Amino acid sequence: MKGLDFGYQKGQQTLRDVSFSIGKGEMVSIVGRNGAGKSTLSKLICGFETPDAGEIFLNGKPLAEENIRRRARHIGYVMQNPNQMISKTMIYEEVALGLQRSGLTEEQIREKVEATLKVCGLYPFRNWPISALSFGQKKRVTIASVLVLDPELILLDEPPPGRISGTIPTSWSSCGA
């Protein structure tokens, strides 16, 4: 990311001259007060918003050349509220949803989904309705739904509930991060 500027209203910049790079395999937290622009930054990376200036790169290629659909092949985005992401009634179905049009066989989908559910500690609940889950468990389902797609970049707009040593989200670390 280089020289990124963005404002929702003309003359009021939310982000000004933001520049940084993240290496493959790195885990980075962007911390700030409410309204500091953390969610805005995620929206810009995903292509939901367009920067006023600057460029965003993924693997050295400018993301401006990619539409939202193509970016989604490379970027997994976990929203703050899992209820805004969940569209299926059962855990297994929700995690499998993103793979349905991937060209994988049903057996390959099953293997990937089950492996991801095991990593995220959700396998015993795979046939449960999502409505039976707590907010934190729903958040884990949305993380699993992103992890199963194996994106190059994963954005968590808000850390999941529960922490280890006050820094690493428990459910994120149990999902293999």
Regions inferred by a protein language model and the residue ranges of each:
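Conserved ABC transporter NBD signature motif
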Residues: 54-62, 71
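Conserved catalytic motifs of ABC-family nucleotide-binding domains
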Residues: 150
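Conserved ABC ATPase "signature" region
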Residues: 107-125
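Helix-to-loop junction immediately C-terminal to a conserved catalytic motif
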Residues: 46
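Catalytic Walker B motif of ABC-type/P-loop ATPase nucleotide-binding domains
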Residues: 154-158
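Conserved ABC ATPase signature
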Residues: 129-133
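The feature captures the beta-strand-to-loop junction immediately N-terminal to the Walker
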Residues: 31-33
